[in-house]
UniProtKB/Swiss-Prot annotation:
Gene label: trpR
Residues passing through the membrane, by range: none
Function: This protein is an aporepressor. When complexed with L-tryptophan it binds the operator region of the trp operon (5'-ACTAGT-'3') and prevents the initiation of transcription. The complex also regulates trp repressor biosynthesis by binding to its regulatory region.
UniProt xrefs under InterPro entries: Trp_repress, Trp_repress_bac, Trp_repressor/repl_initiator, TrpR-like_sf
Protein name as catalogued: Trp operon repressor
């Protein structure tokens, strides 16, 4: 069994606070129509591409028409990335899952 030191807990809390700070910054950027320039500043082209791929993974998992292996081939993503997306989707709050289905699949 691994014990977490108070130091690692403090680091985890600091990282969580930094994440929440970013989320608030992004919320403010949306309110002022500066979200695209902010995201372009904060994310590399590869990171933006990876986020787009993750949206596609979630979309296809919600659609349920392809196996994870087929998704791997179709999207060029690693099977571990697809499995993480699947596991995250399974543990997502029901409200979020319904919202994602409505937003991602409504025009499909």
């Amino acid at each position: 069994m691994t014990q977490r030191s108070p130091y690692s807990s403090a680091i985890a809390e600091q990282r969580n606070q930094e994440w929440l700070r970013f989320v608030e910054l992004l919320r403010q950027a949306y309110a002022e129509d500066l979200h695209l320039p902010l995201l372009q500043l904060m994310l590399t082209p590869d990171e933006r591409e990876a986020l787009g791929t993750r949206v596609r993974i979630i979309e296809e998992l919600l659609r349920g028409e392809m196996s994870q292996r087929e998704l791997k081939t179709e999207l060029g993503a690693g099977i571990a990335t697809i499995t993480r997306g699947s596991n995250s989707l399974k543990s997502a709050p029901v409200e979020l899952r319904h919202w994602l289905e409505n937003v991602l699949l409504k025009n499909a």
